[in-house]
A protein has these predicted regions:
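N-terminal pro-sequences and low-complexity stem/linker regions of secreted or lumenal proteins
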Residues: 1-503
Length: 503
């Protein structure tokens, strides 16, 4: 289907807009919002933009392109769209190529002032290999807009079909070198580098899933959600130092950042996505800008080599992770969770807490058939969720951002069925305070990471699990009950810079 529901107001749920005869999407784009607010903007692209200028797939810009090309019957079939026009240009003899470009420029001169602005800012493409030069030219002339979109060609895109990391790094260096050539410009500029897809392999961190009540985030029985993780790099005076920011973001976060900076509102972002995804400001330290670092000029880009195809191992094994830690930004989350087992009713209550300033997304996974599909929570404050247990055994895992993890396993009729282990977070001392309450009729030996204590019937024990740079990890077991286990992993925020999770 081209969209859902059909028509220009439908959602983009497929790649149908790549079809040149697609009507285009009718909602207002972010650049149009910027323009209405008097914010200057421009798209930098070459003849080959690899189909990645999404503005070309919206009705307002399709109309401008149609006005440029005239009536379709007057042009060869393959030149009836701007994409087709630029795709055909490289194979034309030089004189024919120059004449075609001149004809397009003359057609642009006939556009209305409003359409000409849209053409110049969104649809104009410079000759191959000139994107960085065009960008530098605007920097040097003082014409760089407040918001710039850079759409690289295939050879500079880092896409494995025709590019390489070396090629994209060279383009990025040239762009940053242009910005850094003007100290005043560097002092007020942020460069956000996005990737539009992952490597195609399994991502061990599941993305937030929207609740079924948010109709805008579902297509049939399939949630849109945030998809697999992709890298994003922010280069600016306020992000120097290799900091990691583990707040949840998605591609609308860039738009939310523009909203925060320029006071626009993109009404097409639904409330659930705003709840889950931040506006990128937590990745910046605006109070302490840094001077621009000096970087070595990259070597010439080597020729593209044939790509290797990785062979999946016959047996699953943990992938290697970079050793050590990175400096990390403070996060607006403070999640915690614990359970209470109710043997009489055959149920278990999960107590969920987030004492942070922003909503966090948690996902509860059943590993003993407790329910049919994972349960998802968008949490700010506290909530309890009761799980009916159809079997005596339970095994639940709760996952959240920045390595947050809880594992709850045991049985409703075992020796430790009446042992409740609750937790609270002491942000001041950055400790996880654990309380074990033995409401049963027999004594239990409770072990918290080697600190074993005998709790008589009706007794209560308290442990303070220390953290390192805010990171804690604890395992709770009971000698008399091999089925009982609690695993507690996470990071305690205190509003200050920390480090990434140690490997």
């Amino acid at each position: 289907m081209p969209s859902d529901p059909p028509g220009p107001e439908g959602r983009a749920v497929t790649n149908a807009a790549y079809n040149p005869w697609h009507a285009g999407y009718g909602w207002t784009t972010v650049p149009e919002r910027l323009q209405s607010a008097g914010i200057s903007w421009k798209t930098y692209q070459e003849w080959d933009n690899f189909g990645d200028n999404n503005l070309e797939y919206f009705t307002a810009f399709k109309k401008v392109a149609a006005g440029l090309l005239g009536r379709p019957s007057l042009l060869p079939y393959e030149l009836q769209t701007l994409a087709g026009f630029y795709l055909a240009l490289p194979s034309m003899p030089a004189p024919v190529q120059d004449a075609a470009v001149l004809a397009l420029e003359n057609a642009a001169d006939q556009l209305s002032p409003a359409d000409r602005q849209l053409y110049d800012r969104a649809l104009y493409r410079s000759r191959p290999g000139t994107l960085a030069a065009e960008f530098r030219k605007d920097v040097e002339s003082g014409r760089l807009p407040q918001v710039s979109y850079l759409v690289p060609s295939e050879v500079d895109s880092e896409h494995p079909s025709g590019s390489s990391p070396a090629a994209s790094a060279t383009l990025l260096y040239r762009v940053l070198d242009a910005i850094a050539s003007d100290p005043d410009l560097w002092a007020k500029t942020a460069v956000i580098v996005n990737f539009d897809e992952n490597d195609g392999y399994f991502d061990h961190v599941p993305p937030p899933r929207p609740p079924r009540s948010v109709e805008a985030e579902w297509v049939g029985n399939q949630p849109l959600g945030l998809g697999p993780r992709v890298p994003m790099t922010i280069i600016s005076p306020w992000t120097v130092g290799g900091f990691v920011c583990s707040q949840i973001f998605d591609h609308t976060s860039v738009t939310q950042f523009l909203e925060t900076r320029f006071g626009i509102t993109q009404t097409e972002i639904d409330p659930w996505r705003r709840t889950v995804s931040g506006d990128l400001t937590s990745a910046f330290d605006f109070a302490n800008p840094r001077s621009r670092p000096t970087l070595a000029r990259p070597q010439p880009t080597p020729p593209l080599e044939p790509r290797w195809t990785p062979t999946p191992p016959t047996e699953q094994r943990m992938p290697l992770q970079e050793s050590g830690t990175r400096p990390a930004r403070a996060l607006p989350y403070q999640p915690d969770a614990y359970t209470t087992v109710n043997p009489e009713t055959g149920s278990l209550t999960v107590h969920l807490v987030n004492a942070g300033a922003a909503s966090t997304h948690l996902a509860l996974y059943p590993y003993a058939g407790e329910f049919d599909e994972p349960r998802h929570y968008d949490l700010l404050g506290e909530v309890d969720d009761t799980v009916a247990l159809s079997d005596r055994v339970y095994s639940l895992t709760l996952l959240g951002p920045n390595g947050f993890r809880r594992e709850f396993s045991g049985a409703t009729d075992s020796a430790a069925a009446s042992l409740d282990v609750s937790t609270t977070i002491d942000a001041g001392t950055r400790a996880l305070v654990l309380t074990a309450n033995n409401s049963g009729s027999r004594a239990l030996s409770v072990d918290v990471d080697g600190d074993r204590r005998k709790l008589a019937a009706g007794a209560r024990g308290r442990w303070a699990v220390a953290s390192v740079d805010g990171w804690y990890q604890a395992i709770v077991t009971v000698d008399e009950d091999p089925e009982f286990k609690r695993v507690l992993v996470g990071h305690i925020e205190n509003g200050r810079t920390s480090v990434s999770q140690p490997t």
